[in-house]
Amino acid sequence: MIIITGIPGSGKTTLVKRLVQDLGVRGVAQDAVKEFLADHLGGTYTDQQSSALGRVTRRAVLELGIEFEKLGEQIIIESALQTSAAEEILQHSPHRPILQIYVTCGLAEVKRRFYARKQSGHRHSVHTDDLYDKLTEHEIRDKYRPLVADNITTVIVDSENLDYAALRDTVKDFLMNKAITEENEI
């Protein structure tokens, strides 16, 4: 399984779409699942309800990845995983290698992207998008820090200075069961 994580607005969704297209592997983005569920459940969402649906969605996306793993299939999961909850879920997964691509970006650029997305009029109404108004940078980076487990190899990428070809090749090697044995920065 490949998990693309990072703080909201860091460029995860853009990256997963590109990797899925270029590598021909399955992929699922947390926001797409959350929006699908919100459309089918209907109604408007308070901050608390949106957060609750987000927790369920993150869990569902990880469980989907685990099920694909059990079937011997590869999938790329994209989510702004809240680290402590995700690590607990992954403890129950088959102990197969996981490649984590942790996407980072300067805070000024993350906020610019985040607020542009919020103000674009194209953002689904289920997203309350007040994260950067409520928490400090330290709290956000701690909440969405990289996952740590014996079977997780982490590659850290800066979406403002991304060597996409190198990252794509790393993901391709992982998919072909080639060992990626140390933490890397690309």
Task: Describe the function of each predicted region.
Residues T14-I66:
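Conserved substrate/cofactor phosphate-moiety recognition/catalytic segment
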Residues P8:
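The conserved Walker
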Residues P94-Y115:
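Conserved phosphate-donor/acceptor-positioning beta-strand/loop module used by diverse small-molecule
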Residues G11:
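Conserved glycine(s) of the Walker
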Residues L53-P97:
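Glycine-rich phosphate-binding loop used to anchor ATP phosphates in small-molecule kinases
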Residues I4:
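Hydrophobic anchor at the beta1->P-loop junction of P-loop NTPases
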Residues K172-I186:
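C-terminal accessory "lid"/substrate-recognition subdomains
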Residues Q119-R168:
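Small-molecule kinase domains that catalyze NTP-dependent phosphoryl transfer to phosphate-bearing small molecules
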